[in-house]
Amino acid sequence: MSISFQQIYPIHIDAAWFTQPFQGFCLDSRKIEVGQIFIALSSYSQPEKNRQFAQNALNAGALAVISETSLGLANEWVCPEVRFLMGEWQQQYLQAVDPVQPLRGIAVTGTNGKTTISRLIAELISSQAKGCAVMGTTGNGILPNLTPSTHTTLDALQLQQALHDYAKQGANFVALEASSHGLEQGRLNGCDLEIAVYSNL
């Protein structure tokens, strides 16, 4: 099934690409695929390269660029809140093109104890013969099969893709670590959480 960005975010943008089918979102200009929308988050460590990364994505076939600040490019839409909206966009896109039963989410946050608590929750749910994924410092996946994780909380696009994949693989629940950094950056935006656990001050 094809879908346009307008169907995901129904506002008026005076640009042809807005109503054209697209092939998903991407944050890394080196991994862009033809027809995807490139999300250009501002790089504070390499601000001079922001425009070049976005231009590289367009050169590689990106349908458009959504940026936090204006980069002066063709097919660019400036959305200062993109960092906090992209998780919801990704969730809606994946559900539109490949519907699944959403996972029932349990998020654990706090200074200490996130890894232990999320793992215990996942083990407990799994013991009741219900598929449970776990995401955090010790790895991501459906117990007992975990793969190493580069971050406690994945970026919003990766997180939604992982949740979608786990649902397709038969999981019913997910217990995930919600780092303060991840929460501040909106990485969990788009997650439908049923329970939030706060371990300590």
Model-derived regions, located:
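N-terminal leader/targeting and accessory segments in enzymes
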Residues: 1-92
